[in-house]
Amino acid sequence: MAYRESFYRYLMTQRDADSSDEIAQFANNAQHDLTFPKQEQDYEKLSDYLELNASYLPSMYIFDRAYRMYEDKMMY
């Protein structure tokens, strides 16, 4: 089975403190979330966590977009 990095690790590649992009802002904020499930890959588990704990995420649509990008990258 091929190695698949965690969503958090992928998300950290999207950080950009100077960007106004929503995914970059999500990544910037997630970096400071000490309880973010850093080893998780599962969409449902991540979604549940974010819905309950991520007040810094203005819309779950941003997570959905970021997760689709993550899935696309993991296919290669």
Curated annotation (Swiss-Prot):
Q: Which organism is it from?
A: Lactobacillus helveticus (strain DPC 4571)
Q: Which family does it belong to?
A: Belongs to the UPF0346 family.
> Which InterPro entries would you find in this protein's record?
UPF0346 (IPR010673), YozE_SAM-like (IPR023089), YozE_SAM-like_sf (IPR036806)
Q: Which Pfam families match?
A: YozE_SAM_like (PF06855)
Q: Species lineage, top-down?
A: Bacteria, Bacillati, Bacillota, Bacilli, Lactobacillales
- Protein name, as recorded: UPF0346 protein lhv_1069
* NCBIfam families named in the record: PRK13672.1
Q: Which residues form a coiled coil?
A: none
